[in-house]
């Protein structure tokens, strides 16, 4: 699933890559695929391995709504849904959309 906590590990294991092979996920809003490719290139330049698999799985249109406090129960309180995409793209300093 594209929302797996460590999607790189999930993809590697499902592709038959042995569990002993390292994998890590680059988490960025829009450019994680490009960042993953750059990271692979850096490792190749440093001669830290022979083969790298890099890619991206952004799916910003499927980012969920969140309800703060729901994990521990809201106890007859008003639940407010927050659009996680809108929140992620809003600059916390000036309140304007980034991108």
What name fits each language-model region?
Residues 1:
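Extracytoplasmic "Venus flytrap"
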Residues 4-7, 12-99:
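Acyl-thioester C-C bond-transforming condensing/cleaving domain
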């Amino acid at each position: 699933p594209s929302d797996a906590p460590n999607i790189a590990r999930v993809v590697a294991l499902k592709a038959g890559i042995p569990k002993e092979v390292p994998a890590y996920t680059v988490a960025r809003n829009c450019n994680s695929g490009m960042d993953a490719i750059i990271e692979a290139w850096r490792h190749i330049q440093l001669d830290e391995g022979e083969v790298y698999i890099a890619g991206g799985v952004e799916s910003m249109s499927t980012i969920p709504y969140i309800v703060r406090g729901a994990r521990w129960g809201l106890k007859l309180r008003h639940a407010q849904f927050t659009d996680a995409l809108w929140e992620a793209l809003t600059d916390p300093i000036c309140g304007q959309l980034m991108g």
